[in-house]
């Protein structure tokens, strides 16, 4: 039997009452006819001139052949991209975090360099970024080799110039203890100055929303009041992403490990202190990591593989004016001849457009992902052009 665990502060009763009310909040949804599930290449969507795709890294015979967990950010006019890489297999002992840079808005990229390598005790995966005016912080998810059940902890590295990096240090909770979990890759800064995120805590991988008021995100994290559904070694809900509605409501969307192939959603009305119990939406999913956020006009977007099956193509962006009704869809990458063949075999190298993460920069929506878990690519949506063909407000 699945059990529900409650992770709360001393105001447990108030949190339960609050979450009961939140359960009545409308979940995000799409119209039944928005996507054509019978068209496996495009879901019935057409290509758009507002969309362009660029290669960040393409493997060669002599290079690493596995890539995933691609995350971008912008710092001091330069685009930065991190991802995990290994010789050929997912989460192999040599898995390290590499980084590449672009000075021309993502058209061309530098050769990747290792910023956090594996050692005899653990391997590393990408944990995302937080930027301030003066510093760029990279989060490094660190996985001890023999920990059972599988889990890990989070470290950070800092640069002020994009070249010289500090040594890795533990990310810390509000009480000074190291974060005993794997941070999700896209922390969400709110207008209040609070950063909302999520982490998969030990033992195993059990998700919880977290928040901090520290602009760099290096310490001060607290676990929110939240209900997850326990599947022993991990929670049912995994790998969330966050957007905000115009009234300030926060929405966290999850991958559902119970294989409904629909996204789950949880809602917070108090700036991330308490969250409703996650519920299944009608938004199709490939049981995969996704990316959500807000455009400059306040509308919400969601990027992923809304196939309703394990298939990780096409790559699609969904848009909503109010953060409830997602009524527009944009084809980012199609399947078929538009999906390049996988060239190098390896463990868990899933075909398709894997684990997208996104950011808005200079009125463009950047989506970074790993194609066939070997090519590192980014798709860029010009938001001015998008307005002409796809109303979002």
Please provide the spans of the model-predicted regions.
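Non-catalytic N-terminal targeting/anchoring module and adjacent flexible stem/linker
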Residues: 1, 22-24
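Structural signature of WD-repeat beta-propeller blades
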Residues: 70, 125, 240, 290, ...
